[in-house]
């Protein structure tokens, strides 16, 4: 297995949410580092958040666990339990099927970098309670209203 070269010019910029839910994420850049190797059991993303940007809309996963490790800068974790500031070396994990939705905001004036590590269950459904929609399984990537 050869090493993959990190190419700063090949970032995925922003989020694919329907407007206006994509707006807070415009300053997000993501590099799916494990995709180049064809890994199917877990994924690792390098994420850069510009000042004022969100990582995602607040969400939780039905069948995927998730871990975030902060490399540089400062991000604010926002959950149903409140807010917590995270900095370099801090780590937080989210269990699958726990409806305590989460996301990160960069409220500082500096770039923040973190790694997002999680499962890759193709049938996972992500629920976005604040935005009022859920994302179908990864292979379909469509958004639909949350069922009552």
Give, region by region, the residue ranges found by the protein language model.
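Active-site donor-binding loop signature of nucleotide-sugar glycosyltransferases
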Residues: 51, 88, 119, 130
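Short, conserved beta-strand element in jelly-roll/cupin
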Residues: 46-50, 60-78, 117-119
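Short, charged/polar surface micro-motifs in flexible loops or helix N-caps
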Residues: 50-54, 74, 83, 98-100, ...
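Conserved short histidine dyad/triad with adjacent acidic residue
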Residues: 27-30, 45-61, 99
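A short, N-terminal "cap"/entry segment at the start of jelly-roll beta-barrel domains
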Residues: 1-41, 125-148
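Short acidic-glycine-tyrosine-enriched beta hairpin
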Residues: 80-96
